[in-house]
C-alpha cells in the first residue's frame, strides 16, 4: 500500500509540493503564534509594573491569547471605589505584506497614550499605527491590509514593552470585527495604597466568567 501512495505522490509533483508547502506554513504559523503568546505573557508582567494594577481576562481558558471579556464591564468597573480608569485591549495575529504572522492590538482610545509616537498621529477612523520595527520592513509605508480590510498608517510608535514594537495598533472597534471578540483583557488603574484584593472581589462579582489578577 505504501508503494502505491509514494507512486501517487510522485505522479503529481505539483500536488506534492503544495502539500509540503502547506505543512511548512502550518508549522511556521504554530511557532509564530507560540512566540506571540510568549510575548503576551512578557507583556503582562510589564503592564502590571507600569500600565495597570489589575488585569482582567476570561477565566478557565488554556491560553490568554484566546481570552474574550465583555468590554461593557468597563463602565461598571469604573464605578467601583478606588478605581481611577480602565482600558481594554484585543490581541490577535494576522499576515501583513510578506510577514506571515504579525501581532495586532486593538486598543481602547484611552490606551493610545501608552504608545509613544515617533512619527504621525494616533489612529482615527480606518487608521492604524505601526511599531517601528514593523514599519521598517513594510514595502507600502502608507497603507496595510489586515484580514482583507485596508487601513491607512497614521503614525509610527515605539513602546516600552519591546514585544509591541513588532505589532500594529488600531482602534478596538475594528479589532473586534476582525477577531470576533469584545476584548482580550481589561486593565484597571487604582488609587495609590488602595486595597487591591477588595477591588478584585468587587470586579469578580460583575461576571462569573472573568479572572482578575494583580
What are these regions (language model features)?
Residues 109-115, 130-142:
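Short, solvent-exposed hinge/capping segments at secondary-structure junctions
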Residues 28-102, 201-205, 210-211:
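Hydrophobic, regular-secondary-structure patches
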Residues 55, 127-129, 185-187:
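Short aromatic/hydrophobic contact patches that present stacked aromatics
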Residues 51, 99-102, 125-127, 139, ...:
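Extracytoplasmic
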Residues 1-29, 41:
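N-terminal Sec/SRP start-transfer signal
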Residues 145, 156-214:
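Mechanotransmission and gating elements of multispan inner-membrane complexes involved in transport
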Amino acid at each position: 500500500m505504501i508503494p502505491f501512495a509514494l507512486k501517487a505522490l510522485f505522479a503529481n509533483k505539483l500536488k506534492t509540493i503544495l502539500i509540503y508547502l502547506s505543512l511548512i506554513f502550518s508549522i511556521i504559523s504554530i511557532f509564530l503564534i507560540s512566540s506571540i503568546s510568549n510575548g503576551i505573557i512578557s507583556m503582562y508582567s510589564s503592564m502590571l509594573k507600569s500600565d495597570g494594577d489589575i488585569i482582567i481576562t476570561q477565566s478557565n481558558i488554556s491560553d490568554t491569547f484566546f481570552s474574550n471579556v465583555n468590554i461593557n464591564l468597563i463602565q461598571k468597573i469604573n464605578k467601583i471605589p478606588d478605581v481611577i480608569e480602565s482600558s481594554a485591549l484585543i490581541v490577535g495575529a494576522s499576515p501583513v505584506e510578506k510577514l506571515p504572522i504579525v501581532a495586532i492590538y486593538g486598543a481602547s482610545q484611552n490606551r493610545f497614550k501608552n504608545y509613544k509616537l515617533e512619527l504621525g498621529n494616533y489612529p482615527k477612523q480606518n487608521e492604524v499605527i505601526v511599531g517601528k520595527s514593523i514599519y521598517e520592513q513594510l514595502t507600502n509605508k502608507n497603507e496595510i491590509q489586515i484580514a482583507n480590510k485596508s487601513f491607512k498608517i497614521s503614525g509610527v510608535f515605539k513602546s516600552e514593552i519591546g514585544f509591541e514594537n513588532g505589532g500594529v495598533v488600531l482602534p478596538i472597534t475594528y479589532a473586534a470585527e476582525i477577531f470576533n471578540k469584545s476584548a482580550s483583557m481589561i486593565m484597571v488603574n487604582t488609587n495609590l495604597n488602595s486595597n487591591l484584593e477588595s477591588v478584585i472581589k468587587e470586579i469578580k462579582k460583575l461576571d462569573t466568567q472573568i479572572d482578575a489578577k494583580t
